[in-house]
Amino acid sequence: METLVYTFLLIGTLAVLFAAVFFRDPPRIAKK
């Protein structure tokens, strides 16, 4: 059970970091 919790926290952290980086620099992706 603990493994599932730790995996969920790890995925959640990575998702938050990815979202922060993605929404911080949207022009670089939209400009082509």
UniProtKB/Swiss-Prot annotation:
GO terms of biological process kind: photosynthesis
Chain segments annotated as transmembrane: 3-23
Pfam families given in the database record: PsbT (PF01405)
InterPro entries per the UniProt record, alphabetical: PSII_PsbT, PSII_PsbT_sf
Keywords: Chloroplast, Membrane, Photosynthesis, Photosystem II, Plastid, Thylakoid, Transmembrane, Transmembrane helix
Record bears the keyword Transcription regulation: no
GO cellular component: chloroplast thylakoid membrane; photosystem II reaction center
Disulphide bond pairs: none
Superkingdom per UniProt: Eukaryota
Subcellular location: Plastid, Chloroplast thylakoid membrane
Membrane topology of this protein: Single-pass membrane protein
Described purpose of this protein according to its UniProt entry: Found at the monomer-monomer interface of the photosystem II (PS II) dimer, plays a role in assembly and dimerization of PSII. PSII is a light-driven water plastoquinone oxidoreductase, using light energy to abstract electrons from H(2)O, generating a proton gradient subsequently used for ATP formation.
Subunit organization: PSII is composed of 1 copy each of membrane proteins PsbA, PsbB, PsbC, PsbD, PsbE, PsbF, PsbH, PsbI, PsbJ, PsbK, PsbL, PsbM, PsbT, PsbX, PsbY, PsbZ, Psb30/Ycf12, at least 3 peripheral proteins of the oxygen-evolving complex and a large number of cofactors. It forms dimeric complexes.
HAMAP family tied to this protein: PSII_PsbT
Family: Belongs to the PsbT family.
UniProt name for this protein: Photosystem II reaction center protein T
Species whose genome carries this gene: Guillardia theta
Gene designation per UniProt: psbT
